[in-house]
């Protein structure tokens, strides 16, 4: 289903290309990147339901579409002095998850030292059990739990900017 989704999206525009040569350890998964760059935004599982908007926004923002956040917050994201991989575990029926996924995607898009991966817990039950995830969204930075539940972009950036 993921290959089908990615192929369909690529067929909608000549500005989108689908490649199937990734080496992400989580399968099924895919990354989103500007042409010529390595992906920093990843989706592990099928981003449907509430997460479909997260995928569309990632495609738009990677291509240069300006996000609806202040210049101050964007500059703060660009200035974050960190190298990090963020994982956010979600459920496709979760109402709070897209805001957190979209915030972390934006951080990965605007700060080249970061990556963000949305992980659909339904696809990765072993990892959910191993990390003892009982509620979503649950966020990890370099495999260390840093937050869960509803969080705004500004709250996440403030937490990272300490």
Question: Where does each model-flagged region fall?
Answer:
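Non-catalytic, surface beta->alpha helical segment in thiol-disulfide oxidoreductase systems
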Residues: 33-66, 140-162
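Local sequence-structure signature of Cys/Sec-based thiol-disulfide redox active-site neighborhoods
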Residues: 1-5, 78-112
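Terminal low-complexity, intrinsically disordered regions
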Residues: 93-96, 131, 158-161
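Structural micro-motif
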Residues: 22-41, 130-142
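Thiol/disulfide oxidoreductase modules built on the thioredoxin-like
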Residues: 127-136, 146-152
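Thiol-based oxidoreductase modules, predominantly thioredoxin-like and allied folds used
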Residues: 12-24, 111-128
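Oxidative protein folding and maturation machinery
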Residues: 1-32
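Long, charged amphipathic helices and adjacent flexible linkers at domain junctions
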Residues: 65-80
């Amino acid at each position: 289903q993921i290959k089908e989704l990615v192929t369909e999206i690529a067929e909608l525009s000549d500005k989108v290309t689908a490649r199937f040569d990734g080496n992400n350890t989580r399968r099924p998964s895919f990354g989103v990147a500007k042409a010529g760059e390595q992906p920093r935004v990843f989706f592990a599982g099928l981003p449907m339901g509430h997460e479909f908007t997260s995928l569309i926004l990632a495609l738009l923002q990677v291509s240069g579409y300006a996000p609806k956040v202040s210049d101050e917050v964007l500059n703060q994201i660009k200035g974050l002095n960190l190298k990090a991989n963020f994982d956010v575990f979600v459920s496709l029926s979760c109402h709070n998850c897209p805001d957190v996924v979209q915030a972390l995607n934006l951080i990965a898009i605007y700060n080249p030292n970061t990556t963000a991966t949305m992980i659909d817990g339904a696809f990765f039950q072993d990892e959910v059990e191993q990390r003892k995830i009982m509620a979503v969204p649950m966020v990890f930075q370099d495999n260390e739990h840093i937050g869960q539940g509803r969080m705004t972009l500004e709250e996440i950036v403030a937490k990272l900017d300490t």
